Amino acid sequence: MLSKQIPLGIYEKALPAGECWLERLRLAKTLGFDFVEMSVDETDERLSRLDWSREQRLALVNAIVETGVRVPSMCLSAHRRFPLGSEDDAVRAQGLEIMRKAIQFAQDVGIRVIQLAGYDVYYQEANNETRRHFRDGLKESVEMASRAQVTLAMEIMDYPLMNSISKALGYAHYLNNPWFQLYPDIGNLSAWDNDVQMELQAGIGHIVAVHVKDTKPGVFKNVPFGEGVVDFERCFETLKQSGYCGPYLIEMWSETAEDPAAEVVKARDWVKARMAKAGMVEAA
């Protein structure tokens, strides 16, 4: 059984696709999770959530209240398509508008943390100008988040600009704002040439949540747990010993699998077994 001090959540894209959040949260509860992380990616379908009506937003809040399963975080990867670092003024403006809408949405439905994708640009070539635009966009975004009391948290990425906690800390120091923090992915962190334990310790005062997935060098998605390079037990031990008490989120993309729930149960049991070995939870 999970300790009450260690919330364990599941990524929306691990569960069957669809727009009924009551069903999704009920399933997450059945599978033993404390929360679900919402995805707002670059697809028109998920981007349209930011334009939900008052009634649609209220339906999500009611589903949270009815099930007791929270939606405390949003993975905002839409900036791949509309990057804050774009050299196109119109694209940058659209990226900031997405950020504004995401912050307003979070404020309305009770989302506390918006995980940001650490790309200055994704589909274009990066340069000094794209990085400058990215910094400026982050500064404006954090000002909006501060007014709304919503935390923006940078993910450690599959991309050189933000592939370590050390690099993300540079942005945290530059912005110098309590509403900008870090949301590391231990899979992405492990896939690069990082001293993972040192990196986790360095970021501990800024880490608000942790993504849990396996990876291989150059392969950042859909690596089955146990088949990659991540030393989960050591990562969990380091975080525990460093005083981290926040949430862990199992990140998977099994929504199109033949039986998503079965895939999730398998991953949940595997992760909880490593948590138990690290002394974080009771052994099953």
Swiss-Prot record:
Catalytic activity: L-ribulose 5-phosphate = L-xylulose 5-phosphate
Residues passing through the membrane, by range: none
Keywords: Isomerase
Record-listed E.C. numbers: 5.1.3.22
Induction: Induced by L-ascorbate. Repressed by UlaR.
Domain of life from the UniProt record: Bacteria
GO terms of molecular function: intramolecular oxidoreductase activity, interconverting aldoses and ketoses; L-ribulose-5-phosphate 3-epimerase activity
Pathway the protein acts in: Cofactor degradation; L-ascorbate degradation; D-xylulose 5-phosphate from L-ascorbate: step 3/4
SUPFAM superfamilies given in the database record: Xylose isomerase-like
Swiss-Prot/TrEMBL GO biological process terms: L-ascorbic acid catabolic process
Top-level class of the enzyme under EC nomenclature: isomerase
Keyword Transferase listed: no
NCBIfam families: hxl6Piso_put, PRK13209.1, PRK13210.1
UniProt record similarity statement: Belongs to the L-ribulose-5-phosphate 3-epimerase family.
Function: Catalyzes the isomerization of L-xylulose-5-phosphate to L-ribulose-5-phosphate. Is involved in the anaerobic L-ascorbate utilization.
Listed name of the protein: L-ribulose-5-phosphate 3-epimerase UlaE
Organism: Shigella boydii serotype 18 (strain CDC 3083-94 / BS512)
Gene: ulaE
